[in-house]
Structures are given as structure tokens and as C-alpha cells.
Amino acid sequence: VVVKAGPALRGIYVKTARGIRAAARRVGLLARLDRAYQRRPSSVAGHLRTLFAIHDVDDLVHLDIPWWTYGAIRAVERRLVELDGSARVFEYGSGASTVWLGNRSGEVHSVEHHAGFAEVMRRVLTQADLDGTVQLHEVAVQQSPHPVTRSGRKGEDTVDYTDYVRCIEGVGGLFDVVVVDGRARVACCLAAVPFLAPDGIILFDDSQRPRYHEGIEGSGLEVQRIWGWVPSLPYPRQTAVLSRRAGG
């Protein structure tokens, strides 16, 4: 079952979660849930704590967790542990995951198209003491009557994400982990393949969305689809982990 939440419903949920979080803090429940989360993030109580962090990058950073399925988080963390903190990472779409990756990698490049959120992320990265590890690339989108690279989102028919997608080319080199969790995801995934290290992985979030299926399957990579609960959401989603085929 795929659950879709429109902007209005999502707004109501976020507002309600913030109100309940404030009440939970006053009565001491939030502190108890914090302790449960620290013991086991994916437990029922741990997941309940994350529901209060919806669309709150500071709270997600506090919880030290990205916004992917728990199974995908474990898969990426295993790869980062194998590389013993030396991983080179490229990320499409910044957020709490940028800090999470920065704390576990040697070098992170994250591209962000939204100027306002890029400013928020610069503050967050400085507070996390990650300015030396994470480089945030702010790349504005272009308006065009005939965009070359579309996002597929409603209301963005004249928005061109070509520069955003090609940011990885400007950085260059091979990456151990590539995260595709921003806009124009199919184009980003395909652009990242030539820059993927032989044992590297691509994390493609929200892979349950129909508009992503053809691009994922056409990447030429092995695809592991991980369905499950996601921090801060009351319903499950899917995150795909892509890797090179054996002998490929």
C-alpha cells in the first residue's frame, strides 16, 4: 500500500505533531521517549519519538538520523563502517542526512537548490562543526519554457534542473556513497552512475513513486528495494539501494 499525503494534509500533520511535542515536553514524556530512542531508534517508542521531528531539521539532527527507511539507514551505515570513516559521499538534497553522513564520512558534497534551506543548512553544519567535512553546493534552478531536465513535480513544468544534476561532474572523482533524495531524481541517479566507485552504492529515496521506476530499472545497477517505516512518518515508504552488478 502506497500512502500519499497532499500538502494540506501534510501541513495539518506537521502542526499537530509540533503541538503534541510541546505538550509531551512539558509533562516529561519527550525526555522518556528520547531515552527509548537512544536505546533502539527503530523500536515502537523510538519511532514514536521521531514522529515529533517531522519537517524539523534541528530535531532530526538532534536524533542523529536521516529521513530514509530504517533498513536503508542500516545498509548505508554498514558501508560507512566498512570504510572506517573515510567514505567519499555525494548527496542530492541536503538535510539532517547531511549531518548524519558528515559525522560518519571523510568527505561529503551536498547539493541544494533552495536558497532559503541552503542558508538553514549552513547554520546547521556550522553548529555541528562539519564545515571542514561537508561542502554545501547551492545551485539555483533555471526557468525555461523548454527545460532540459525536469523534476516531474506538479507546478514545475518550466523549471530546469540541469545545473543541479550536473553538480557531481564539477566535483568529480569517485564516490563510495551517492544519495539521491532531492529533485529530478531519475536524472540525478543516471548522472551519478559514472562517478560511483566499484564497490559504491546509490541510495534512492521514495523509490515507490511510479515516476521513478523506469529510471531506477534503467540504471544498469542491481536494485535492492527496502520497504519499511521511516523516521518522523506514521506510514511506511520504500528506499532503494543500488550497486554495481557482480563482474560489471
Cite the ranges covered by each PLM segment.
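Membrane-proximal basic amphipathic "stem/tether" segments
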Residues: 1-64
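Short, basic, glycine/proline-bearing loop/turn elements
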Residues: 57-62, 82, 174-178
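Short, charged/polar micro-motifs that form catalytic or ligand-binding hotspots
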Residues: 62, 66, 87, 91, ...
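Conserved phosphate-coordination/catalytic loops
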Residues: 63-71, 155-159, 182-183, 233-236
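Short, well-ordered alpha-helical scaffold segments within catalytic/effector domains
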Residues: 66-77, 95, 162-165, 186-189
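SAM cofactor-binding core of SAM-dependent methyltransferases
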Residues: 70-145
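Internal catalytic-core helix/loop-beta-alpha segment
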Residues: 136-191
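C-terminal substrate-binding/active-site "lid" region of AdoMet-derived donor-dependent transferases
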Residues: 168-172, 177, 182-248
